[in-house]
Amino acid sequence: MLRECDYSQALLEQVNQAISDKTPLVIQGSNSKAFLGRPVTGQTLDVRCHRGIVNYDPTELVITARVGTPLVTIEAALESAGQMLPCEPPHYGEEATWGGMVACGLAGPRRPWSGSVRDFVLGTRIITGAGKHLRFGGEVMKNVAGYDLSRLMVGSYGCLGVLTEISMKVLPRPRASLSLRREISLQEAMSEIAEWQLQPLPISGLCYFDNALWIRLEGGEGSVKAARELLGGEEVAGQFWQQLREQQLPFFSLPGTLWRISLPSDAPMMDLPGEQLIDWGGALRWLKSTAEDNQIHRIARNAGGHATRFSAGDGGFAPLSAPLFRYHQQLKQQLDPCGVFNPGRMYAEL
């Protein structure tokens, strides 16, 4: 097992050498999410040695850690203080890291009610494309005007710089949590979800799977109990939400390519080409399909959303419009002028 260690100087030296030699770098943690995006060829920059919790004072509701720190280590520290990561990030592997969580920017079933990974990032330390090790943001939540590089790194898949340290806001764990299951049709489920979203219910999870609506209630004991009586259904183990988050439900073993389709919260039922599982109260559709990539991207775009293929290769991320592509291109050129950070991971031209 790797010890806590500040390995930033060695990482900085390797980056500067790569910039000097114009050698592409493959930024790597535990590889738990390596299946996302296009394969990158280059010299490996392994950040797993750069690990350890730098600062955590539960009274401040902020934790700062080096990027190679295992996510399970972070969550264990938070749990011991009765706190949690509000965005409920997936691991997809026992060694998933703090840095990989932010680089991929994926959130779990609680996302619509608590917020995204980006919403809770307060500050970072980053090795830039100029070969400098700089700090952005801090450990307090504040309004940010202009260029917010810390949050820009969320979901950038390591293409804009090397994260070395991340500060995030955390929240207390709910005092009560209860999961329910109701066997109803998809049409009935979507209708009820739309109605519930107009009410102050302590909902933190809504998923339609296996001909049933799965509901998670979290909050004060009184509000959870009242909502349970109002919504009905049978009480089930809360383990379901972890299995959903980690893609361990039987749905994810079905044949076909797995797609993640993000949609507006009020998106209606959709006739998708394959089997689907509905999460985020309808705003996220997991799809197992053998349809062509272009067809899936087109369906998502026409519904006001975007699709991501959950397997390696070209065409996994939603195609960019010409103006948006130019913006990405300019951003990459400004932050990584030598093109050494995970070139082509998201798009071949970037």
Swiss-Prot record:
It comes from the Bacteria. It is found in: Cell inner membrane. It is an enzyme of class 1 (oxidoreductase). GO terms for molecular function: D-2-hydroxy-acid dehydrogenase activity; FAD binding; glycolate dehydrogenase activity. One of its GO terms (cellular component) is plasma membrane. It comes from Escherichia coli (strain K12). This is Glycolate oxidase subunit GlcE. Optimum pH is 8.0-8.8. The glycolate oxidase likely consists of three subunits, GlcD, GlcE and GlcF. Component of a complex that catalyzes the oxidation of glycolate to glyoxylate. Is required for E.coli to grow on glycolate as a sole source of carbon. Is also able to oxidize D-lactate ((R)-lactate) with a similar rate. Does not link directly to O(2), and 2,6-dichloroindophenol (DCIP) and phenazine methosulfate (PMS) can act as artificial electron acceptors in vitro, but the physiological molecule that functions as a primary electron acceptor during glycolate oxidation is unknown. GO terms for biological process: glycolate catabolic process. The keyword Flavoprotein applies. Its EC number is 1.1.99.14. Disruption phenotype: Abolishes glycolate oxidase activity. Is unable to grow on glycolate as the sole source of carbon, in contrast to wild type. InterPro entries: FAD-bd_PCMH, FAD-bd_PCMH-like_sf, FAD-bd_PCMH_sub2, FAD-linked_Oxase-like_C, Oxid_FAD_bind_N. It catalyses: glycolate + A = glyoxylate + AH2; (R)-lactate + A = pyruvate + AH2. Keywords: Cell inner membrane, Cell membrane, FAD, Flavoprotein, Membrane, Oxidoreductase. Induction: Part of the glcDEFGB operon, which is induced by growth on glycolate, under the positive control of GlcC. Also induced by growth on acetate. Expression of the glc operon is strongly dependent on the integration host factor (IHF) and is repressed by the global respiratory regulator ArcA-P. Its main location: membrane. Residues 1-173 form the FAD-binding PCMH-type domain. In vitro the glycolate oxidase activity is inhibited by the sulfhydryl inhibitors CuSO4 and PCMB, by KCN, but not by the metal complexing agent EDTA.
